[in-house]
């Protein structure tokens, strides 16, 4: 007799479809909000990932995809999506001066005003639960007073000329500061019809819009009469001369426009960017190669030593040698920064006492790079040592016994047996280590901050900067403004370079071992 297995209430199809339906409605609501805010890329990404997830978990035929979907969704959200955004920004002029859309930049400019009339001193006086606004003309000595009003929203106050002083004590600067936004929304109308608004914490003045938008999209400065047109090549409203050519004046804020390959060509044509970029690229490759070589060499040698059968206290040595890996890297880096201090660091004190020298670790390019390699080797060798310790267990003892019978010594065993058998399984990990050190942002940022700085460059660049640090400084530390478009272009080039180097290394390794 067949046994029908009873389902629990939480396993019912009705509950499943109800939950999926609610999730679908929530996702649809979020997508509509993103689209309404102009975040089209976020809206499309959310729609694709959510729709795929709902389909996979609702369809029995896609059951196997339930195990793959979380990983693929995570990769798409945290790897592919930022990559696409970075590449998209690289083809724009997006920067600290060009962050807004054209419509928003135009709106900001049209909201600006200028003082076009008299300036009046004002006072704020309590009238029970309400307030009265008093204006005084310093030139004529006339005083004006409003009826009692309450703060809240935009409002127009009709003022009357008066000779009597308002009752109550005049509000101090603290009260005016607390109600500054409400006062800014007030338009005071004088008996002659002139309108004045708050221009400072103690004054009202006549204001007019600074710019007027003409029918052809031209902005006219009402104060100077200069005309401006949107220049979509640079993303700014730019002045135009009498003969219709572009002038020198630009209005901020600018707006974001597509610039094509301009940011990429700047990297290779602007000498102020090209020279530091090429020099930093070479240093980045050299730094990564030397670091990988030294960490593997030190880690492999130490792994062989702690695996030596005749060595006593091997467990203690293993723990001590692995300690640098257990300490968070940023703590070790900051400790080394103090140890390498040129004036008070223990390393310079020791070198001065023994050899009479005090290297300029932070001001000389060569010694600064040497310091970086020393610190990075210290941080990286424990990882390689742990890997080699595990791989050494897989080497048969028969090989060493046979070599001993042939009269081979420790060095011959290492170079003829140990190294060839370890290097092949270590190769993928060495490539991964190379890629990691190629983008080792934290080490440079905490230890040297890219210094010492290079002179004569268009963008901020240092002798110890890696490409990723150079990109960061362009994006967030540029003296002439944050240039996100150029930084995104360099980040895209870094991605292509690291990918190309990894492919070349993998192919070279495959050819070698095939």
Swiss-Prot record:
Which SUPFAM superfamilies does the UniProt entry name for this protein?
MalF N-terminal region-like, MetI-like
**GO CC aspect terms:** ATP-binding cassette (ABC) transporter complex; enzyme IIA-maltose transporter complex; maltose transport complex; membrane; plasma membrane
Extract the InterPro entries matched here: MalF_N (IPR035277), MalF_N_TM (IPR048464), MalF_P2 (IPR029345), MalF_P2_sf (IPR047103), MetI-like (IPR000515), MetI-like_sf (IPR035906)
The segments annotated as topological domain Cytoplasmic are 1-16, 59-66, 307-318, 393-425, 506-514
Subcellular location(s) per record: Cell inner membrane
| The ABC transmembrane type-1 domain, residue ranges | 281-505
Pfam families, per the entry: BPD_transp_1, MalF_N_TM, MalF_P2
Membrane topology annotation: Multi-pass membrane protein
Among the record's GO biological process terms, what is one? DNA damage response
The record's annotation in PANTHER family points to: MALTOSE/MALTODEXTRIN TRANSPORT SYSTEM PERMEASE PROTEIN MALF (PTHR47314), MALTOSE_MALTODEXTRIN TRANSPORT SYSTEM PERMEASE PROTEIN MALF (PTHR47314:SF1)
Q: Which family would the database say this protein is a member of?
A: Belongs to the binding-protein-dependent transport system permease family. MalFG subfamily.
User: What does the UniProt function comment say about this protein?
Assistant: Part of the ABC transporter complex MalEFGK involved in maltose/maltodextrin import. Probably responsible for the translocation of the substrate across the membrane.
Q: What is this protein called?
A: Maltose/maltodextrin transport system permease protein MalF
Report the source organism: Escherichia coli (strain K12)
Cite the source lineage: Bacteria, Pseudomonadati, Pseudomonadota, Gammaproteobacteria, Enterobacterales
